[in-house]
């Protein structure tokens, strides 16, 4: 049990836009880039926001949308990363009225 507890000690990273931007801008194939992919996929799949994504949209395309949004909006990076993911995808794939 002590060993298990020790595995989870250490500094806690804030899950804000700065953290996500760093992860998403990491080189493709790195652990950080994989964390970005998994995080965006998880937030997207849990989202209840009405979106009109193309049926063939890929995780890589969603990562590109979110990464571009984060890079283009540095003034928002202090916000929670889950909100930024939702905002980026909603901006790119909102349904036409």
Segments predicted by a language model, with ranges:
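Sec/Tat signal peptide C-region and signal peptidase I cleavage site
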Residues: 8-14
């Amino acid at each position: 049990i002590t060993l298990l507890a020790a595995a989870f000690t250490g500094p806690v990273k804030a899950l804000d836009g700065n953290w996500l931007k760093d992860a998403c801008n990491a080189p493709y194939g790195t652990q950080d880039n994989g964390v970005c992919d998994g995080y965006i996929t998880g937030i997207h799949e849990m989202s209840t926001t009405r979106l009109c994504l193309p049926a063939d949209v890929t995780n890589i395309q969603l990562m590109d949308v979110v990464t571009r949004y984060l890079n283009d909006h540095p003034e928002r990076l202090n916000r929670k990363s889950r909100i930024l993911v939702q905002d980026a995808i909603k901006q790119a794939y909102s349904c036409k009225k």
